[in-house]
Amino acid sequence: HIRAVDAPGIAHVKLIDATPIGINVRSTVATYAGVHDELRKLFARTPEAKERGYKNGDFSYNTGRLRCPGCDGTGVVSLDVQFLPDVTIPCPDCRGSRYGRQAGEVKLVNKAGQAASLPELMDMDVTAALDFCQDRKTVRQKLETLKQLGLGYLTLGEETPNLSGGEAQRLKLASEIGRSQTDTVFVFDEPSIGLHPLDVQVLLGVFQA
């Protein structure tokens, strides 16, 4: 087995495979792709947020004060069923959105005059969110990458442990695109697994870009 290879100019080797992205239900498409952080910044700058004293961190469903108190920001609750395994259901308070009522009262307005709260955006698929955020450069670029990789149908709030192997692999690739990779070699393990031929063409286009 080769333990080390001398390759001038190469400092990193990254494996992009189809293994699941963790088991944490708090990890979503938006958080893994870096979209959620950018959205929180945008919502913290809205007039409603400033008026109420909300900061960037308040819009986190993990630790922020706008997270749902019923499920603590997980979007689900467990029911104790005697003599049977616990049953997990969507939180009845937030209906799976992970956020409390106050979060729904803070709206982001785009140039077209459309308004949406952060819970509403997290419930959109990538394509719909991209349409809404056309005038928000940092968010738009990240969403465009996801769509270019054929992930436009995934909702931003989709839990990453629920993704298929092919989806997980493309999401990992999306998280790397946009960073400086001049000294990096990527190793892909069956990148076309589970993909429709049209999606394979899209993926090849990304490789060649």
Each language-model region and where it sits:
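Conserved phosphate-binding elements of NTP-dependent enzyme cores
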Residues: H1-A209
